[in-house]
């Protein structure tokens, strides 16, 4: 009897406990924040499709298509059931899982009318969740401190980069002006050098043409001289033969006494002695017109002896000199000797007149006055006053230019000493001063161009252009950097120059925020995309337009950010073909607002536990 009574009391207590843990039927499955919506006598379906009376709430019959009237039963497939899970985290499940024989809620409230008895495990699960929540709160607290420090650094760095960019733009403007001036001067130098080059080419061409023309004239004169000499030799031979014949007829009785003279005459007219004949004829035309009538004969007599050792080539040059006006030292000496011999041998005057009459008039006319014209041309530029005057002008101009250049260098040295003394002059001021000195020094109207000064202008142009190029490159880098969105408080600013890596199997994944993401296998690199944007309020980084998959889309990567004390990339996966995901822990996500929410959640969980224990 006593045992029976104890069992009955135990069953009644268990039933009472189960009834106490189960909420009332009319509020079953309704979230606490929605209870006010169901307090009226007539309740409207949330989708606006109809209305229902309060007594039809959770009557296991679906009146609203969206399941508004059946949150605690499985009558409506679109209904939602709220698990309170006291001591742990509440969750929401589909109403179709209510009373299906599977315990979905840790407090067992979803199986209130089934054959399954669900054990309440919320305390055990809640304790583990609270411990995890406590760790998360601690991480957030430390992360918030790090984040605030990084934000302060980022703001200072951002302001510094903005100031540098503004300064560089100002320097670029000044330096661009200097480069433009130097470019203009450089073009003038190149133009002057080109004009000088063309002038030299033209002068060289003219001199070459004159040389060719002179050579042609000399050849023509040589050919004509040879032709005249040949004609004169022919006439001389005929005259000599005629005289020999007359002389032979007049002295036929004295043949034996004149045999040596005849042999000598024959030898003189032998074909092998034609060179001697041409030598004899040449000096007759070479003597000046002002000489006495006896001079040609003396020259004819002396020429064979003086020119006996000359070759045909030398004789040709001797004859050609009469055409070109050039003097031959040996011929001049022979002429002098002939003039001296002329006064010592007057007895040959008659013979001289006879030989002079034999010279063709055409030859004398063709050479008459030519020597005097050549001499006039030869002494046309022998004006000593003109030579000295031009030399003085050049020296004065050169000295004046050198003095000007030296004064600029001295002033440059003085300026440099001033900069050293003050210590306040920047590199840009020095460049400006140097360029001004160069532009003042260089004389663009001087011909030919001063190579040292031109080289100096080019050097300053190269230096200024190189500096300008570096400044423009830095401006481009800063402009590209500062155009990005670094978060509400610039919390992601220090991400710009960083890359994060994670090894997953045989691959190494590399993520560089604001730039690119890649997958590396050995020496092969596959692009997972270039920087696109932030998503979900700076909680996701999106990389798009990577390498195309074979017969598929372009690769892409989404990096989900979460609070962490260090920047660590992990959890890289490919849930869909060529669509990658990863997780990046960073202090940048440890914001104070989220920390407050977690602290409130932890406090609420602790208060609920204390209340339930009571």
UniProtKB/Swiss-Prot annotation:
<comment type="subunit">
    <text>Heterodimer of a catalytic alpha subunit and a beta subunit.</text>
</comment>
<dbReference type="GO" id="GO:0006491">
    <property type="term" value="P:N-glycan processing"/>
</dbReference>
<dbReference type="GO" id="GO:0017177">
    <property type="term" value="C:glucosidase II complex"/>
</dbReference>
<feature type="compositionally biased region" description="Acidic residues">
    <location>
        <begin position="383"/>
        <end position="396"/>
    </location>
</feature>
<dbReference type="InterPro" id="IPR028146">
    <property type="entry name" value="PRKCSH_N"/>
</dbReference>
<protein>
    <recommendedName>
        <fullName>Glucosidase 2 subunit beta</fullName>
    </recommendedName>
</protein>
<feature type="disulfide bond">
    <location>
        <begin position="549"/>
        <end position="578"/>
    </location>
</feature>
<comment type="pathway">
    <text>Glycan metabolism; N-glycan metabolism.</text>
</comment>
<dbReference type="Pfam" id="PF13015">
    <property type="entry name" value="PRKCSH_1"/>
</dbReference>
<dbReference type="InterPro" id="IPR044865">
    <property type="entry name" value="MRH_dom"/>
</dbReference>
<dbReference type="InterPro" id="IPR039794">
    <property type="entry name" value="Gtb1-like"/>
</dbReference>
<comment type="function">
    <text>Regulatory subunit of glucosidase II. May be required for defense response elicited by pathogen-associated molecular patterns (PAMPs).</text>
</comment>
<keyword id="KW-0611">Plant defense</keyword>
<feature type="signal peptide">
    <location>
        <begin position="1"/>
        <end position="20"/>
    </location>
</feature>
<keyword id="KW-0256">Endoplasmic reticulum</keyword>
<keyword id="KW-0325">Glycoprotein</keyword>
<feature type="compositionally biased region" description="Acidic residues">
    <location>
        <begin position="352"/>
        <end position="364"/>
    </location>
</feature>
<dbReference type="InterPro" id="IPR036607">
    <property type="entry name" value="PRKCSH"/>
</dbReference>
<dbReference type="GO" id="GO:0042742">
    <property type="term" value="P:defense response to bacterium"/>
</dbReference>
<dbReference type="InterPro" id="IPR009011">
    <property type="entry name" value="Man6P_isomerase_rcpt-bd_dom_sf"/>
</dbReference>
<keyword id="KW-0732">Signal</keyword>
<feature type="compositionally biased region" description="Basic and acidic residues">
    <location>
        <begin position="194"/>
        <end position="222"/>
    </location>
</feature>
<feature type="compositionally biased region" description="Basic and acidic residues">
    <location>
        <begin position="324"/>
        <end position="351"/>
    </location>
</feature>
<feature type="compositionally biased region" description="Basic and acidic residues">
    <location>
        <begin position="372"/>
        <end position="382"/>
    </location>
</feature>
<feature type="disulfide bond">
    <location>
        <begin position="499"/>
        <end position="512"/>
    </location>
</feature>
<feature type="domain" description="MRH">
    <location>
        <begin position="497"/>
        <end position="592"/>
    </location>
</feature>
<feature type="region of interest" description="Disordered">
    <location>
        <begin position="194"/>
        <end position="396"/>
    </location>
</feature>
<feature type="compositionally biased region" description="Basic and acidic residues">
    <location>
        <begin position="231"/>
        <end position="272"/>
    </location>
</feature>
<keyword id="KW-1015">Disulfide bond</keyword>
<feature type="glycosylation site" description="N-linked (GlcNAc...) asparagine">
    <location>
        <position position="115"/>
    </location>
</feature>
<feature type="disulfide bond">
    <location>
        <begin position="563"/>
        <end position="590"/>
    </location>
</feature>
<dbReference type="Pfam" id="PF12999">
    <property type="entry name" value="PRKCSH-like"/>
</dbReference>
